[in-house]
Each structure stands twice: as C-alpha cells, then as structure tokens.
Amino acid sequence: MTKVIVQGKAQGTVLKTNNPINFLGAVDKKTGIIHDQKCDIFEKTVKDSILVFPHGIGSSVGAYTIYSLKSYESAPLAMICKKADLTVASGCALANIPMIVVSKEQFDSIENGKEVEINTESTTILN
C-alpha cells in the first residue's frame, strides 16, 4: 500500500537509511550533507536523491530545514517513508517535495543506489 502525502513526480537515485532523520540537527541545510555520525548515511548528501528513511524525529523546526534545503537547492527530489510524521510532511508540503508513505514490505524492497521514479498521478506510484 502506498499513500501520497505530497503530490509530484521525481526520478533519481535512492539514498536509503534505516535510521530516522532529525532534519534540524543532522542535515546541513546549505549542502544537504548528513552530519549525524550515528546515521548510516553519515557524510552523504541528500541533494538530488530519492531519500528513503523510516520517519523523521526531532523538533518541528525541522520542517523549515527541509524548506531551507529546497531554497539552497540541496533538497532531495522526493522522500519515501514508512511513517508520515508532521515535521517531514509539513516540510515537504512547504518545499513542494513529493512524499509518499509505503508499507514495511515496500520499504524493505527498495535498494540503496537504485534508480526509481515516483509519479503520484499514476496508478503505479513507485517504479
């Protein structure tokens, strides 16, 4: 089952982590680089990726960090989560970044580094 949170289209390379992301504390809004040493995508950039992660954590100010990522042209092309939290959903809506929520099975089947396409207007949302 796939649920659309923010509509849109995107195609790109998956950057996947099994760690929740704290956008306010862990992501550099100017570069998109992950600075959380506990995260398995430490020192990778979310810029121009299809960012796949379980859910967001931390302050609601993280929504503005997501918006800032877009303003600095360092944002992911789309986000895929297992659970929609208010911070990430709000940030994606503000920044107009497509966001979908997928089942655990779908999440587990998405491979890091794979090229994927998201089209929320299609019957097949995730290819």
Language model region names:
Residues V4-V6, A10, K16-T124:
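Feature captures the catalytic cores and cofactor-binding loops of soluble hydro-lyases/lyases
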